[in-house]
Amino acid sequence: LEKLIMVLQKELTCLGGAVAVPYKEKLFAILSNNCNETIRKIGAINCIFRSNPNDQFFSCTNTDGEGALEPLANILGGTKPLNIGLIGYGGAGKAIAGFLQQYKDKHEILLFNRTLPNKKFSDELEINFIDLKELPSKIGEIDILINATSVGSQNNLNEKLIRREYLHKLKNSSLVYDIIYDPTETMLLRDSKEIGLDVINGMEMNLLQAVLAYKHTNNTTLSLEELKKIMGSSD
């Protein structure tokens, strides 16, 4: 893999590209010196690109986290302090946690997972890691609940992340966000909607991470909105 990257870097007609599982962490290890501090804390990349067309080396980023938070930009950028509950610390969860860091002085960020990360990750991200078993006792405090696990996806359709009785503990004003896009309505979102909560699915994140990757790779001056329209959606 490292030899391949060295060859591609020398070929200036190769602008970059997308990085998929299982190479996100492996490529990060090779290109970590060319990432910003946020990406180093995440420890995984999904996009390589040249910051300048004549650069001899690839830069790298992770558009999963940036794409996931874009639909929440107006809420997160508001003046009201919020409690944000993020469930899952896999590839997408790490990316979202890394980009949520920019809001840690304004909002309380709680990361729920079945297993707790080592102290190094916890200290670097400066986020409160909590055992998933404690979610039922904490859920009533949460303003934005984000599912970054695969529970509820096509491969796990019959699995339930949170029992409906626990969703009833959420505030009436709470927002439930599931980054899964297939199906477009997971059991978590269906239950939340029936309770009367606002919900967001993963369709926009899926588009935005690709739009952002295209923008990086092609070094374009087109705006995010212009690229969204070109790539199939302005919603």
Tell where the protein language model's regions lie, with residue ranges.
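Glycine-rich adenosine-cofactor-binding loop
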Residues: N62-G65, L72, L76, K80-Q101, ...
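Conserved S-adenosyl-L-methionine
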Residues: Q102-E108, I195-D198
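Rossmann-like adenosine-cofactor binding region
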Residues: L125-V199
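Short glycine-rich anion-binding loops that position phosphate/pyrophosphate groups of nucleotides
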Residues: A20-K26, A92, S150-S153, D182
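Phosphate/diphosphate ligand-binding glycine-rich loop within oxidoreductases
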Residues: L1-L76, D191
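NAD(P)-binding Rossmann-fold cofactor-contacting core
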Residues: D105-L125
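Adenosine-phosphate binding glycine-rich loop
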Residues: S174, I179-D235
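Short, conserved loop/helix-junction motifs that constitute active-site signature segments
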Residues: G77-K80, Q101-K104, R164-S173
